[in-house]
Amino acid sequence: MAIDLIQEIKTQFQNVEKGGVFFIKQTVMLEEIYGFARENTRFAEGGCCDEANEAEYQLLETYWGRRFKFGGLAGYCHGGRTALGAVSHHVPESEGQKNLLLVAGAHIGYHDGQWGQLPRTGQPGVTTSCGSLAAIVGAGYDAIRNKPADALDRQQRTVEQIILPYLEQCARSGDTPDIVAATRHLMQQIDADLEKIVADLKSGFTGQIALITGITINTVQGNFFSPTRVEVFGRS
């Protein structure tokens, strides 16, 4: 049952909600308090490219209009300053108001009490989620530290370098790397880097910027969301 599942998820992510419910609440808040509307808002999404995350992004896209994508593997903001600077010039204006809605974050699967696991339609076994992050955690510190750079795998290289300090800490302490802890470590970096990029945007963007970040939990009963930041900048 969904109630039992959410209680299990709350053992690791206490503020979790059903993904769709959470984002509907944020949509109402942005409309009623800050004046966001389809005609004055550009929605930009920085999640992982894994199709398991699509339900909530498609929900938001249906409401706010076509999305700009600045994420990639593992939900890191690979588009960086260039992508977010670009989308800040794509924002529609209506009656003197324009708004930029940024949604981003990492993700992790949960199935039968196991974190980092997710069954997928049409596949007989259970897969990993996030696959990018699971590969790094499974490889371990020495393998990632000594892995040569690959010009055809730059996004994965970026995620590896973000997770490397966590893997080193585990290696030094003798602890086994944990997918939940690695996901949190990645999420902290996403939040820190987006904070810097949004600070840059605020100096040149005359509208409001809503930043919603957090960890999506993928399950066979749908996605859940554990927010880490919900902020609106630039309100007069």
Across the structure, where does each feature detected by a protein language model lie?
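N-terminal, polar/Ser/Thr-rich
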Residues: L102-A106
